[in-house]
């Protein structure tokens, strides 16, 4: 796994849409670009510093000509007061020239998203979302439906809608064609911080990562009021989500996502039905903050460290397929695919006590009721089906830390 040492903690990472170049936004305010080859060997392309304060978010134009960077900075306005000014910088990716727009927000900007030609969006710590036309000095629209920080954006091009997730526990949908400052829709409070968002199944379903480690599934045809399914399994928060590029072998990119969790793992997870395909990258004790996929099927992941980790997705999925073929040739079965003789007894219709995570919500109980109705009129009882019960299908055994110890509960009873 190639690693690029950038010299400072990384807040965000994006890839050029056509060239083999990756961009990083750093804690020290630098934006560094690296060119890489098919073997993952990198070479520094350029380094600019739009601000002396941290660069929190990056987004790149569809043709790769401009890179948008946001963060926190101080500016001196004439000879008056030196105050907190939030900047939005535009970087020419060919010449590395910078144009800065001070005063874009009143608080730190966390996210920026290129939507379409002449329209970008920004979201800040106070939950304010603004739409910008780079040709104009002032924002074209401002939304204030959120009261906590904006965590992520998703652009739905078919309806020209911008979906934003927030730390206040809701997501909102804004129709950029409307001139109203109110959102088109807003979800109910999900009782959890919403941290990341991607679309699957041809943008018909939306996957949202939460602080409690649950993937919430929204169905666009059912409305935005509440999620239709919840997929547990991650032991800690899901801070980053990313789609897979088309053309990868042995995987359906329309139903598989990459998840970045605070436990330091980047996982490949199939949604509907839910299945852990494997651990793509391991950052050790460092939480995953951002994931991005670039040309050549490379995925870049960053955490609370100075390293950008590059992983070859094609090699990962080919290795997964070869492992399965080898086990099948040797007559070895996976733990999740053991024979009926080695699995625990689980009678259909008694699944309520042992729920399985299959991404289908209440469909399991519905199938159980149908089976029970069909068997009411039959005297002989149907053969009981045996299957293994998975409590945490997405959990991964984590090696014990250097200073970590095991303490029995009784130790705390005397305190």
Swiss-Prot record:
Keyword Disulfide bond on entry: no
Bilayer-crossing regions: none
Annotated localization: Nucleus, Nucleolus
Composition bias type Acidic residues, residue spans: 337-346
Alphabetical list of InterPro entries matching this protein: WD40/YVTN_repeat-like_dom_sf (IPR015943), WD40_repeat_dom_sf (IPR036322), WD40_rpt (IPR001680), WDR55_POC1 (IPR050505)
GO cellular component: nucleolus
Source superkingdom: Eukaryota
Basic and acidic residues bias spans: 390-405
Sorted UniProt keywords: Nucleus, Repeat, WD repeat
Low complexity: compositionally biased ranges: 358-367
A Pfam family: WDR55
Positions annotated as WD repeat: 5-44, 104-142, 145-184, 189-228, 233-282
Segments for region (Disordered): 328-415
Major location category of this protein: nucleus
Family: Belongs to the WD repeat WDR55 family.
Name of the protein: WD repeat-containing protein JIP5
Natural source organism: Laccaria bicolor (strain S238N-H82 / ATCC MYA-4686) (Bicoloured deceiver)
């Amino acid at each position: 796994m190639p690693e690029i040492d950038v010299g400072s903690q990384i807040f965000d990472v994006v890839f050029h849409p056509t060239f083999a170049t990756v961009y990083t936004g750093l804690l020290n305010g630098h934006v560094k670009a690296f060119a890489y080859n098919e073997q993952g060997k990198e070479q520094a392309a350029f380094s600019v510093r739009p601000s002396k304060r941290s660069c929190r978010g990056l987004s790149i134009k569809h043709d790769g000509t401009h890179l948008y960077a946001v963060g926190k900075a101080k500016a001196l306005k004439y000879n008056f007061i030196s105050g907190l000014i939030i900047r939005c910088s535009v970087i020419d990716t060919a010449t590395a020239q910078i144009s800065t727009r001070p005063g874009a927000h009143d608080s730190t900007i966390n996210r920026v998203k290129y939507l379409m030609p002449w329209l970008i969006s920004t979201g800040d710590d106070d939950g304010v979302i603004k739409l910008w036309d780079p040709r104009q000095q002032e924002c074209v629209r401002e939304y204030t439906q959120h009261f906590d920080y904006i965590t992520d954006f998703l652009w739905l091009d078919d309806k020209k809608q911008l979906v934003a997730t927030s730390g206040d526990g809701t997501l909102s949908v804004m129709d950029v064609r409307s001139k109203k400052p109110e959102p088109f829709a807003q979800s109910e409070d999900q009782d959890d911080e919403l941290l990341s968002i991607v679309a699957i199944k041809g943008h018909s379903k939306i996957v949202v990562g939460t602080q409690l480690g649950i993937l919430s599934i929204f169905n666009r045809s059912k409305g935005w009021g509440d999620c239709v399914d919840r997929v547990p399994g991650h032991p800690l928060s899901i801070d980053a989500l990313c789609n897979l590029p088309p053309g990868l072998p042995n995987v359906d990119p329309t139903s598989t996502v990459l998840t970045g969790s605070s436990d330091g793992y980047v996982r490949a997870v199939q949604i509907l039905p839910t299945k852990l395909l494997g651990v793509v990258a391991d950052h050790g004790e460092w939480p995953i903050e951002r994931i991005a996929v670039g040309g050549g099927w490379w995925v870049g992941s960053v955490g609370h460290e100075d390293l950008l980790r590059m992983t070859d997705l094609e090699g990962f999925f080919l290795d997964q397929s070869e492992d399965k073929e080898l086990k099948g040739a040797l007559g070895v079965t996976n733990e999740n695919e053991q024979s009926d003789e080695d699995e625990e007894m689980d009678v259909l219709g008694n699944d309520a006590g042992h729920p399985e995570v299959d991404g289908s919500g209440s469909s399991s109980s519905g199938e159980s009721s149908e089976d029970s109705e069909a068997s009411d009129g039959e005297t002989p009882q149907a053969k009981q089906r045996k299957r293994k019960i998975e409590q945490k299908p997405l959990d991964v055994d984590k090696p014990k830390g250097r200073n970590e110890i095991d303490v029995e509960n009784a130790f705390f009873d005397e305190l």
